[in-house]
């Protein structure tokens, strides 16, 4: 699994720490860190919650860009 730089960038754009995002999503900071590091595959429910908090879509944050 690759690092999720899109999530990290979106979180930083909202001036949120991993702890801030974790608290808003109801998970631990370690969970957010693991998602951003590519070490954890979150549930669809958690993905949707993170998207709502950051004002992004699933496509924006979690789907891989297809190479043409």
Segments and roles (model prediction):
Residues 1, 12-13, 40-41:
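Short amphipathic helical patch at the helix-1/turn junction of helix-turn-helix
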Residues 13, 52, 62-68:
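Short, charged recognition helix plus adjacent turn
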Residues 5-24:
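Short basic helix-loop element that most often maps to the first helix and adjoining turn
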Residues 45-60:
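DNA major-groove recognition helix of helix-turn-helix/homeodomain DNA-binding modules
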Residues 27-40:
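Recognition helix of helix-turn-helix/homeodomain-like DNA-binding domains
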